Regions:
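Anionic-ligand binding region
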Residues: 67-70, 76-91
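P-loop/Walker-type NTP enzyme "switch/lid" segment
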Residues: 1-44, 135
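Beta-strand-loop-alpha "switch" segments that mediate conformational coupling across diverse proteins
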Residues: 10, 97-99, 109-144, 153, ...
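Short, hydrophobic alpha-helical segments
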Residues: 157-168
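Glycine-rich phosphate-binding loop used to anchor ATP phosphates in small-molecule kinases
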Residues: 38-57
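P-loop/Walker A phosphate-binding loop and immediately adjacent motor/lid segment at beta-alpha junctions
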Residues: 24-30, 83-101
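Short, conserved loop/helix-junction motifs that constitute active-site signature segments
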Residues: 63, 85-90, 113-117
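Inter-motif core of Ras-like GTPase G domains
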Residues: 53-76
Length: 169
């Protein structure tokens, strides 16, 4: 089937997260899974939604990442956090939920473009199709393959591929 295959990890509450982080067996299982999966499927892209500075369980996965995307929304809270963040060499900022009709979004984005932040040139716009797909419990591509967000995700993939290939070669 064409499109993206998604394996959702789900939401882990704080108590379970602490238990997972403290469990040596959980760490071993995750490391084994990651190693086995990447050996069996070396050309597969794996996207992980993590908070690496707060998540010791996946810290080694983040260290092995070819590309790290720090997802942000053009707003004051994110602006403050970006200015406090130290970026890794393989880390880029991905603007998410951008609304072209929002003056504040335009102002922050324009200001960020003049900064030294390592920006991904693709920005993901706010798209109602995503909310509708979630409500329908369908992947976005299956729900509405021709929506703007699917096109932007494809563009993001096209931008990431040369970076991945240059790091492999």
């Amino acid at each position: 089937q064409n499109g993206y295959q998604i394996l959702p990890f789900g939401v882990v509450n704080s108590e379970d997260k602490l238990h997972l982080q403290a469990s040596a067996a959980a760490n071993q299982h995750l490391q084994h899974f990651f190693t086995t999966f990447t050996q069996q499927y070396p050309d597969t892209l794996i996207f992980l939604d993590l908070q690496p500075e707060h998540d010791t369980l996946f810290k080694s996965w983040v260290a092995k990442a070819n590309i790290v995307l720090t997802v942000t929304t053009p707003e004051s809270n994110c602006h403050i956090r970006l200015n406090q963040h130290t970026f890794a060499a393989n880390e880029y900022i991905l603007v998410n939920q951008f609304c072209a009709t929002s003056q504040i979004h335009q102002d922050f984005y324009q200001f960020w473009q003049t900064s030294q932040f390592p920006f991904c040139p693709i920005k993901l716009h706010r798209d109602e199709a995503l909310l509708e797909a979630c409500a329908s419990r369908l992947p976005l591509y299956d729900y509405r393959a021709n929506c703007m967000l699917v096109e932007e995700i494809n563009q993001l993939l096209q931008w990431c591929l040369p970076l991945l290939l240059s790091k492999k070669g």
